Amino acid sequence: MTQITIPAQVVNGHLQHEKSLAELEGEDVLATLTVVPKHAPPIDWQKSRDRIDSFNALKDGWDSYRAPAPSTDAVSQAKLFLEEAATSKFAPSRFSPAVVGGVGFTFKRAERKVYVEFRNSGSVHALLSDGVSDPVVEKVQPNQSAYADLMLRIKGYLHE
């Protein structure tokens, strides 16, 4: 039994590799496929902090419609959450001002998504969705301890 490693990639749904298997003709071969996803480049946490700070400069109607600008409290809570994400070494896929007033973060992996929203009202909610079953919405207490728990929940949900 021979075991070999062949670097390959998936292109248009097909496995492509550059190594010929002709040299193994007639041998019993154990083939194991390990999929290692490509990851986005590492996040620049300081740039992300600065970007969230920039949300304080937005005015009502920032989206060219009637979106309320994020409140200073929503921005502060979003920064606290970003710090917890940095501590957890788990970067959001994206974050932006929310059109309902506040700041929203999206975490995605395959079909699963978690959207965390810091509303101008002071409330914080997390929506967990897999694209198949009904989304689940959870209320989150606006404090660092709850954000640490939420980061664990997000990691677990996206990697189930």
What is each model feature region?
Residues 75-120:
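Amphipathic, interaction-prone secondary-structure segments
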Residues 1-92, 125-160:
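Eukaryotic low-complexity, non-globular regulatory regions
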